Amino acid sequence: MTNIKILPPNSVNDPIMKLMSSKTKTRVLFKAPLLTQSGYGVHARQVAKWLLQFRSSNPDSIEVKFDPTSWGSTPWYVTATEDEPVIQQIYSNTIKAAGEPFDISIQLLLPNEWTTDRAAVNIGMTAGVEADTCNPLWIQACNKMTMVIVPSEFTKKMFFDTAKKFNMEITVPMVVVPESYYVSGQDIWAEASVDKKLEAVDTSTNFLIVGQMTGDSFLNDRKNIGYTLRW
């Protein structure tokens, strides 16, 4: 597969490496909306590529299994595509028994969906919310995990500000790992054409919307694109 690397800080690897060094083969479960056509799905497949590459480099020390979940009403990939060849590998490594025990679970979900009953080490990953406050129950959810990974300093600040607002405390490590990766030997911006398209716009007042319509009506579209276009 293409040599794709995700670049986490060393603190992300510490609990994983500590456990792996004490076992012959470490079983890792990655639970996420891996097969959905969504932003979380794209992020999940980036992480899956890194896990599969790590397994390929360390076949005797790590076993990787996937637990695909839904993401709202977004559609699923059922076959591998040119853009997402990892789809077939995800299907081939999907868990068959719901109660299988694992050493490490990585869960790319909303915090209220995280669980701690599948593994000894449980790592929560989430983008949080695009706001300055979240449900305080999410702070409790964070504290149940071994550690939490977020994609931005904004999200991390949101969690800590929420904890302070409700007289709570985040008691587990929370680290920032951007949702980015590079392909070795390639300039990921080399073929970007968005600048040319923007330069071709000849109107003076313009709005750029980035998102996916996720509902079957304006009322249940969580990105609110329908009303954005109407208004």
Task: Identify the meaning behind each predicted range.
Residues 36, 76-83, 214-225:
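Short, flexible/disordered intra-domain loops and linkers
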Residues 25-26, 120, 205:
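Nucleotide donor/acceptor-binding cores
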Residues 146-157, 166-193:
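Donor nucleotide-sugar binding/catalytic pocket of nucleotide-sugar-dependent glycosyltransferases
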